[in-house]
Each structure stands twice: as structure tokens, then as C-alpha cells.
């Protein structure tokens, strides 16, 4: 994996955390000049991004790094909508209604054998899945927004919840 420029994401993360470059340097066991270089725009290697994400324990920064390095789901930010739990819940409800309006048709289509699906059927199933993805994406951002109120990152919350999910048999493992 290659190094990436992350100066803007770092600036936003330490501002959210009320932290300084020196604190980040000490917490990640990296030279102050190295950390300062990342803030100036020097590319950061993947290992450094991982260490900083772990130390910062900031959901948006972690999502930013995952997106930059692995091209996974980007963090949701909007220049139009507030990122408050209330606003995100309203948007989530709208997305849920939109998905539900497509659900019955999609569920019927999903009962067909794959070879019997027409191109139109596949488009309707894809439309349903994409609307479902909208809903999940917004719901995830809503959870992050709620967790920010109690100063907990999404990853920390997931780590806390894994034992419960295992007891419920939602996931395997010891």
C-alpha cells in the first residue's frame, strides 16, 4: 500500500479531539517533525495512518483513512444537512420509507431463479439494494453522531458490542 496525503483529515481530527500535534506525536511514538510533516502535506505511510487512527480513536478520521487506503465506504459529510442525531434520524426515516416502497416488488423478484430474471428485474433489485445502502449509510452516520455525544468512537462501540453479538449468535467466535 502506498503513502497518502492526509493533512486535512489530521487537522480536522485533532481539532475535534482538542489535541495538539505534540500530543499526537507522543501518543503514536513518532517524531514531532514527522507528525508536523504529515500536517504540512507529506504523505503518511499506512502504518502511521493506522497508529494515528488508533490513538485518535475518532470515527470520522478512521473512516477517512479506510476510504483513502482501501477505498471502502467514505465518511458521510454534508455541506447542506446538519450532522446531528435528530437531522440524521429524519433523513434515515425518509430513506427507510423510500426503500419500503420498493420492498414488496424486490422480495417477489428475489424469489425467482437467477436465470429467470430479466434485465428489468435486475434493475429493480439493484435499485432496492441501493436504496437499502442509502439507509444503512445514513444510519451508520447517525450512530457515529450519537456516539460522539458520549465521546466514543464507532470502533470502540463495536469492540464493546462484539461479546453481545457473539452471545446472540449474530457472529461466530469465542
Regions found by a protein language model. Name each.
Residues 115-174:
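Charged, low-complexity intrinsically disordered regulatory/assembly segments
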Residues 65-91, 157-174:
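Short, charged recognition helix plus adjacent turn
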Residues 14, 25, 53:
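The alpha-helix within a helix-turn-helix
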Residues 20-26:
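Short alpha-helical "recognition helix" segments of helix-turn-helix
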